[in-house]
């Protein structure tokens, strides 16, 4: 199905009005595939990188379902969205409220880190859609404070991370409590891994599988290039100069190791760049504080690892900077997908040392993008990059095939060709065998 406008999804005027207010005009790849399947009441198993509109891909069908089938009297939630973290739950709920702002639908959250009495309104008043974390919700279910019998649609967001954090059993218990539901949607950053596959098989019924990467049209909105660096110190200088000269208004700097996050952030601050950082083991209040600083403009850039940045939803990111290249091309797409959202343009740059060119080559081949090198005046590299911009890399499978072919060749050459002599073949008929047994 080739849908170019949201109107073609048969969404209600209230939802279309909200989309227009948010600045959305064209559906993303994941939305084009997931929304029609979900609106046909099929179970959906979806995967898409961060920044591809995944949240709206499941919220729009859920909200449309509530509008298509209005309840006759107030009651407990009909849509339940499970997320692995409180932070992500708050972001999903915020987006749901924005999409439902012109309706009378009620949105609520149930998460840890909130006093018990603060959730009283969720239990005692009418709720249409609830976003929750598994641990706290299961506690309320066991205490019979949350009624699962009215849940018609169960949605898992970032299911892979939910399993990694050890919430698999809690999630399955909640799914069992919502056994009267009509539909289940499961979204994940990746659909790989035995644990996730088994989890999905147990919870979904003949799902429509949606594995949508951002289309090349979407990626064209992102200007991409890289800088060749001589060393880590050279990378820091390039990064600082780039932030100062490229009008970075709201940027995310990605690094590999969490122990480097604080150090790089402090280095940038010493150079006069307003910076904050995120690392995996930070307290929730510290994480929220760092994110709020970027959103409010107190800082210009946020330094983060891929793990620490999972689930963060920040609008209007002008630049994504790969201080360290990721090990996989998938992760690269996840990173750059945080800019150029909602039809806007963005920039993604990488800082590449000589030993990174294998990774750069993988990214080029996977994304089919032409990434060109640029130079910052006064910070030209002293070393030359590998020929043709990348190191020729051979995969393990290719190495195994090459080795196998070599061994076969050796065996063939080892076999001596038997010379057929006339005396061994003459007068051979039905009753006489060759005198040479090798013939």
Curated annotation (Swiss-Prot):
Compositional bias ranges of the Basic residues kind: 394-403, 412-439
UniProt keyword terms in alphabetical order: ATP-binding, Cytoplasm, Helicase, Hydrolase, Nucleotide-binding, Ribosome biogenesis
Biased composition, class Basic and acidic residues, residue ranges: 381-393
Subunit structure: Interacts with the 50S ribosomal subunit.
Compartments in which it is found: Cytoplasm
Motif (DEAD box): 157-160
Record's protein name: ATP-dependent RNA helicase SrmB
């Amino acid at each position: 199905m080739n849908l170019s406008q949201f109107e073609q999804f048969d969404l209600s005027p209230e939802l279309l009005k909200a989309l227009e207010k948010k600045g959305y005009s064209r559906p993303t790849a994941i939305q084009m595939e997931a929304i029609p399947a979900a609106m046909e009441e099929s179970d959906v198993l979806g995967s898409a990188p961060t920044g591809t509109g995944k949240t709206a891909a499941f919220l729009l069908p859920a909200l449309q379902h509530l509008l298509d089938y209005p309840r006759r009297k107030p009651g407990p939630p009909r849509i339940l969205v499970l997320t692995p973290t409180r932070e992500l739950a708050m972001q999903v709920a915020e987006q749901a409220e924005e999409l439902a702002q012109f309706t009378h639908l009620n949105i609520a959250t149930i998460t840890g880190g909130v006093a018990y009495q603060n959730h009283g309104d969720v239990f005692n008043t009418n709720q249409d859609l609830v976003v929750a974390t598994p641990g706290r919700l299961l506690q309320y279910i066991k205490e019979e404070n949350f009624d699962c019998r009215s849940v018609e649609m169960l949605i898992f967001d970032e299911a892979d991370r939910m399993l990694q954090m050890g919430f698999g059993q809690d999630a399955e218990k909640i799914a069992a409590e919502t056994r009267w539901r009509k539909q289940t949607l499961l979204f994940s950053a990746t659909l790989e891994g035995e644990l996730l596959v088994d989890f999905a098989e147990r919870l979904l019924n003949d799902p429509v599988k949606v594995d949508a990467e951002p289309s090349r049209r979407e990626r064209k909105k992102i200007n991409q290039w890289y800088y060749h660096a001589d060393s880590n110190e050279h990378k820091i200088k390039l990064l600082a100069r780039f932030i100062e000269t490229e009008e970075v208004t709201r940027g995310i700097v990605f690094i590999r190791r969490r122990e480097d996050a604080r150090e790089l952030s402090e280095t940038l601050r010493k150079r006069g760049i307003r910076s904050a950082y995120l690392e995996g083991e930070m307290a929730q209040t510290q994480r929220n504080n760092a994110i709020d600083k970027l959103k409010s403009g107190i800082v210009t850039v946020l330094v983060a690892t891929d793990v620490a940045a999972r689930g963060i939803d920040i609008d209007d990111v002008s630049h994504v900077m790969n201080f360290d290249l990721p090990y996989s091309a998938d992760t690269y797409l996840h990173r750059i997908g945080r800019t150029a959202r909602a039809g806007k343009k963005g920039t993604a740059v990488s800082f590449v040392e000589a030993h990174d060119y294998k990774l750069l080559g993988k990214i080029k081949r996977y994304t089919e993008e032409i990434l060109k090198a640029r130079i910052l005046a006064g910070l030209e590299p002293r070393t030359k990059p590998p020929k043709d911009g990348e190191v020729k890399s051979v995969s393990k499978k290719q190495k195994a095939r090459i080795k196998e072919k070599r061994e076969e060749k050796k065996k063939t050459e080892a076999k001596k060709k038997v010379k057929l002599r006339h005396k061994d073949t003459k007068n051979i008929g039905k009753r006489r065998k060759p005198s040479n047994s090798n013939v």
